[in-house]
């Protein structure tokens, strides 16, 4: 069934995206995808749930406004000795969470920290809006952070925020500024709104600037880099960077 006026060729040419995964199981939410990540991490590393000290979940699609999705994941995973919290930073969320988690390890405060990025974007995407529905899908991933004596880890991080661009990518209603009403729901104001051109420009400029800054701060050049792993919302953004 065709939902918007587009084709696979049009989408692929402009975004590089071939498919989007959607969580369709009734009653399943972001925490369920996060739980699967935790289970796989614990199994892969031979770690018991009660050994986890902290779980950080980067998400803009929490199961509910509160409690934190991280705490729901911990409960479902049986990690009774851990505490958790969410980070809401959208596309930058996993990097923010990874840097935060690494600092808890480096400080010596905790030994085992799980960092998850998880979103059920299908819950907040308008599938009649071509500017957003062709981009977003559902998914989750994560890492288990532990101390090591080999000098490996997060070498450096530069994190930035620019709230002045919020008018170009946001949700119009549903928060404390404009609580949900029958009118806001009817007007589809609880879905993602995006103005693509300024978002594209900001993404390219921001990534290039930050990459150059972190290289310069560590006395490195692009010739020293084997891999650049960017945010993957759009192939044209990646190619421009």
Label the predicted regions:
Residues 1-27, 129-201, 205, 209:
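Condensing-enzyme catalytic core mediating Claisen C-C bond formation in acyl metabolism
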Residues 9, 48-54, 81-83, 111-113, ...:
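Short acidic capping loops at alpha-helix termini that bridge into adjacent secondary structure
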Residues 10-14, 18-32, 60-113:
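Conserved catalytic cysteine-centered active-site region
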Residues 11, 41, 52-55, 73, ...:
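Buried hydrophobic positions in well-ordered alpha/beta secondary-structure cores of metabolic enzymes
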Residues 37-53, 209-226:
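Phosphate/pyrophosphate-binding loops at sites that engage ATP/ADP/AMP, CoA/4′-phosphopantetheine
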Residues 58-63, 89-92, 117-122, 160-162:
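Acidic, glycine-rich active-site loops and adjacent beta-strand->loop/helix elements
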Residues 58-64, 225-241:
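Glycine-rich phosphate-binding loops at beta-strand->alpha-helix junctions
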Residues 106-140:
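Flexible, glycine-rich active-site loops centered on histidine and acidic residues
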């Amino acid at each position: 069934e065709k939902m918007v006026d587009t084709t696979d060729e049009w989408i692929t040419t402009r975004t590089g995206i071939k498919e989007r995964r959607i969580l369709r199981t009734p009653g399943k939410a972001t925490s369920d995808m996060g739980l699967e990540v935790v289970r796989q991490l614990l199994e892969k590393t031979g770690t018991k749930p009660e050994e986890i000290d902290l779980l950080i979940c980067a998400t803009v699609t929490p199961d509910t406004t509160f409690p934190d999705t991280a705490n729901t994941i911990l409960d479902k995973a049986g990690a009774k000795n851990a505490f958790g919290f969410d980070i809401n930073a959208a596309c930058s969320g996993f990097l923010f969470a990874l840097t935060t988690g690494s600092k808890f390890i480096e400080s010596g405060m905790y030994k085992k920290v799980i960092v998850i990025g998880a979103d059920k974007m299908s819950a907040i995407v308008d599938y009649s809006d071509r500017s957003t529905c062709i981009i977003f899908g559902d998914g989750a991933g994560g890492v288990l952070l532990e101390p090591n004596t080999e000098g490996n880890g997060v070498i450096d991080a530069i994190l930035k925020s620019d709230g002045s661009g919020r008018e170009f990518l946001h949700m119009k209603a549903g928060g404390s500024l404009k609580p949900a009403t029958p009118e806001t729901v009817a007007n589809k104001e609880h879905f993602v709104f995006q103005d693509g051109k300024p978002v594209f420009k900001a993404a390219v400029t921001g990534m290039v600037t930050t990459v150059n800054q972190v290289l310069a701060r560590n006395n490195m050049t692009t010739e020293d880099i084997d891999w650049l792993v960017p945010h993957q919302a759009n192939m044209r953004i990646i190619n421009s960077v």
